[in-house]
């Protein structure tokens, strides 16, 4: 009875979801190809097309993967090539097409002075002690080591807003972490003894927001729902 067999109700549901996913990938792939043609043609809107092209490529990779193992960078181009993310933006091209040293890959989204604001759903938070409803992450320092250029050392302050005993509360924690050029990830290391950190995934071509989640340090298992950090332009 538990078999998902052709012709059965469960099979129809699975097949429908698979068809829907394939259709989404095909639509995105079509848009990527159209933008690639615009990039080849050049024109006044080249930078706009390039940014949108990278955004769409990222979305396709999210749906079907990019063919690389975890902690690897997809070089792109006509031939499949993957390199360790430790080799990205280290000052020496390792991809055959030099993509790992491209300025779009190696630019820095979380510059010093950046404020990222995220709103969290407390209903599914079963592991934090405060059950925060808002994170305000202020990046105070970004440093790049000459001997380890593929990572940026990041320091900042995390303002945690939550409700306790019927009142709005705020705590501020000093935090540190790193930015990984190869994966476009900002990682905030656990600031407290609960060993919960934050991982935030930027999309190539979009520095204004990143998809974030609280994670257990040991397992990287997500704690509660994902949320979105949005860059605040004016936080004076």
From Swiss-Prot:
- What Pfam families does its record include? Eryth_link_C, Ldl_recept_a
Question: PROSITE patterns recorded for this chain?
Answer: LDLRA_1, LDLRA_2
Q: Which residues form the signal peptide?
A: none
Report the SS bond pairs: 68-82, 75-95, 89-106
> What region holds the LDL-receptor class A domain?
66-108
Instruction: List, alphabetically, the Gene3D superfamilies matched.
Output: 2.40.128.620
Spell out the InterPro entries in the cross-references. Answer: Eryth_link_C, Eryth_link_C_sf, LDL_receptor-like_sf, LDLR_class-A_CS, LDrepeatLR_classA_rpt
Q: Which GO terms describe its molecular function?
A: oxygen carrier activity
**Sorted UniProt keywords:** Disulfide bond, Oxygen transport, Transport
Tell me the function of this protein: Acts as a linker for the assembly of heme-containing chains in the construction of giant hemoglobin.
| Quaternary structure (record) | Disulfide-linked dimer of identical chains. A model is proposed for the subunit structure of the Tylorrhynchus hemoglobin, consisting of 216 polypeptides chains, 192 heme-containing chains, and 24 linker chains.
State the name under which the record lists this protein. Giant extracellular hemoglobin linker 2 chain
């Amino acid at each position: 009875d538990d078999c998902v067999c052709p012709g059965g109700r469960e099979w129809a549901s699975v097949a429908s979801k698979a068809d829907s996913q394939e259709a989404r990938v095909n639509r995105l792939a079509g848009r990527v190809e159209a933008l690639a043609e615009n990039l080849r043609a050049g024109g006044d809107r080249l930078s706009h097309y390039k940014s949108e092209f990278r955004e769409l490529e990222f979305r396709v990779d999210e749906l079907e993967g990019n063919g690389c193992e975890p902690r690897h960078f997809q070089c792109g181009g006509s031939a499949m090539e993957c390199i360790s993310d430790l080799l990205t933006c280290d000052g020496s091209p390792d991809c055959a097409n030099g993509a790992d040293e491209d300025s779009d890959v190696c630019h820095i989204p979380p510059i010093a002075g950046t404020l990222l604001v995220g709103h969290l759903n407390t209903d599914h938070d079963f592991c934090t002690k405060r059950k925060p409803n808002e994170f305000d992450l202020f990046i105070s320092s970004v440093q790049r080591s000459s001997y380890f250029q593929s990572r940026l050392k990041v320091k900042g302050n995390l303002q945690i807003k939550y409700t306790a005993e019927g009142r709005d509360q705020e705590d501020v924690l000093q935090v540190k972490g790193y930015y990984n050029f190869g994966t476009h990830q900002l990682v905030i290391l656990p600031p407290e003894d609960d060993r919960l950190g934050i991982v935030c995934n930027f999309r190539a071509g979009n520095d204004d927001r990143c998809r974030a989640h609280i994670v257990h340090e040991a397992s990287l298992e997500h704690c509660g729902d994902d949320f979105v950090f949005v860059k605040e332009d004016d936080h004076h």
